């Protein structure tokens, strides 16, 4: 049963009402990877954030790392947004944020803290303008991952005009900024959310961010797919899915990477 606060805003109610139409999918199949990389490209080109490339995809080396997981949010069966996460610990200290802001983040790893770095956020540029909930629901992947992996911090590297979203709704704080990435046209800032301080407030204010154990197990591990279970229901009627990994999706990714960096 979904959590039911005494009162909910119309905004929260609208998102909760949307949830049964949503599939939160762990991306593993070559055709799904290709669809996500094309969505990234469309979104970034539409916002003039990257240079065009012949392949029409946006992919980088971080997509190939062992601590990387890529997700797609499907509305009525159509890919509507995507997010990539890296689970970052002292044993797996690799993620885009570490490269750009290592002087701030590496000391935290040395102290035994951990991160979930959410990156390559993108939303279908041709979506219905009324679907203002998509950014919240896309960030939900990183939030669920932070809960599942008991991460100390949730990271997001964003351009300045998006910072208010993370500050207002998720309690993120700016740790550093004004950095230029080699593939991105606009300077970015590092925003960090302390899960120890923010989780209870987020759960209360944005109840649709919550998830059950089965949903997180489906998305962030292979335990259920290995048992032949490919989908489960979330707290609010949404579906979480995780397909069986193909034998060699990496060969496709490396081929695309050679012609579509950005």
Predicted feature locations:
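Conserved donor-binding loop and adjoining core beta-sheet/short helix segment
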Residues: 53-110, 116-120
